[in-house]
Amino acid sequence: VILHIQDWQKLLADARVRLFAGENAFAELRAFLPANTGCPWPKISVTVDQSIWPAGMTIDVLNQESMAIANQHLAQVQSELRMFASTFTPQSIAEQYSSGKPLNVLGITSRYTTFLKHSMRDWLSAFARLGHRTEIFIEPADHELSNNLVMAEACARFKPDLIVMIDHFRAEMPGLPQGIPMAMWAQDYMPKIYSPDGGAAQGPRDYVLGFAYEKMRLVHEFGYPSDRYLITTIGMDPERFAPRPADDPQLAKYVCDVSFVTHASLSAEQIVKEQMGRNDADAKRLLGSIFEQLRAVYDAGKTIVAPPGIRRMIEQGFIDTRTQPTPELVQQLMHLFYMRVNNALFRHQALHWLIDLGIDLRLYGRGWENHPAFKRFARGVADHEGELSLIYQASRINLHISPLGSLHQRVMEGLASGGFFLLRRSDGDIIGRHYARLWGFCQRLGITSDEQLKACTDPQVQEMLGQAVDIHQCDPFAEKYTFMQLLQTMHDCNYLCSAGCVWGNDYDETSFGSKAELEKKIAYFLGNPLERQRLTQSMLRPVLERFTYEKTTTRLLEMIAADQARVAMQSKIDADTVPLAA
């Protein structure tokens, strides 16, 4: 009757609606739930005809029954996966990974992310271009969820030789089998990763990819295995970012003097004001004390990029406001002031230098239209899929401004698109040069420990140590790892995290550290298109040689093969060793 009164065609056609009708309606619902655990189960039922439901049956009882059936099925699937994983041995893994034969690579991600699902897509595309079979595990629709059973079923069906995830490790996903090699790309700060539990959860076939400094923290502070950590940066896909013909009509819309792409449009003052609005009077005083210290640095025309400098301001804020610190509060304040407030101050300071230059400046990203000083330059959000490449190529100068450094995916994608960049100089970009010089001296002088390094009286060594202290904003010998371990790690990865080392003289030509330097370089490069083209091509070469998803993927597979070969060899040695008689 109600369907004659109400037009529910659109409602009933929605993918979120499951319609069970007729005399077998309940039986069909009962069978559907445990067989479709990715679909959220109903929590509320409205009964019109009680005869449809068996006596004593409610939606809660039905869900409990369905959960029991699903758990039984999960146990069965996990048993099958254990049988499959038992066929993997160190020797077989090493041989398979080094043979060049196609692997089955399962990538796990979520549609409820922004950047990460695109990064996983590009990573799997690199595996495919290298000849491997790939499958992505992702929620099939916006209303569906992943869980242990759905994940285990995907593994049982695809039978992966390698599982890859971003920002999650195996132990977080109980549906994943042990024994099959798994790689986590740690791209963001995640509390579960940065914890002793995260390190302790790493099994003998768990591998990590991540940044160089993060390796030092994860290995020496949280217990991650050093020999199963691959230092890299977030990759780029040259297949998705490539220059178009110069006469492509789509470029015309984006031609400008200078462009900058970022969603970091909120001013530092707005960020702090929003935080104050969520807290009591005592917290407001603490936030205000820290912010005034940080803002004074930028008001003086300076910058701060090293976390210890921010930490000291937070510690001073505790003293000034007589606030009792806790580790959790310190961590929250570090995230707020280092990752957000300082980021805004660093970026917006440089943008203010451009306002009066009379150039065609365009800002792409969310919220710029609301910024009182910059709203006239706002051009809306750029689509990552196609528009970004057009912006990079059409802009005479692209800017990259970040206190975290210039070896960023956006810069690499922009270079691959044919875009020229000016980079705001950061200490993190050039410290690799100091490390390289210092490592060279240590090698020549036979220095192998922190004690020897501190005791060295060579004036050049002392000068370089002083430079390291200035950049680190702290005692480099007071970390949870030794300074020599840091120097060794940076040397072993060929200073992959240092833009000054990767791009060499090109970095010096394209970086700026002051308003006067930025104005001078903008004027010069706007008038020299051939120089822009030369530097773009020169800076792209090391990107293609070292930072594409394919290069990183190849290095990962080589690391896994070598690691498992070592394990196999050690097992053979142990088996062949005859214990001495007592």
Predicted regions and their residues:
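N-terminal donor/sugar-recognition subdomains of glycan-related enzymes
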Residues: I2-N104, T134
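Catalytic core of nucleotide-activated saccharide and alditol-phosphate transferases
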Residues: I180-I319, K551, V567, A575-V578
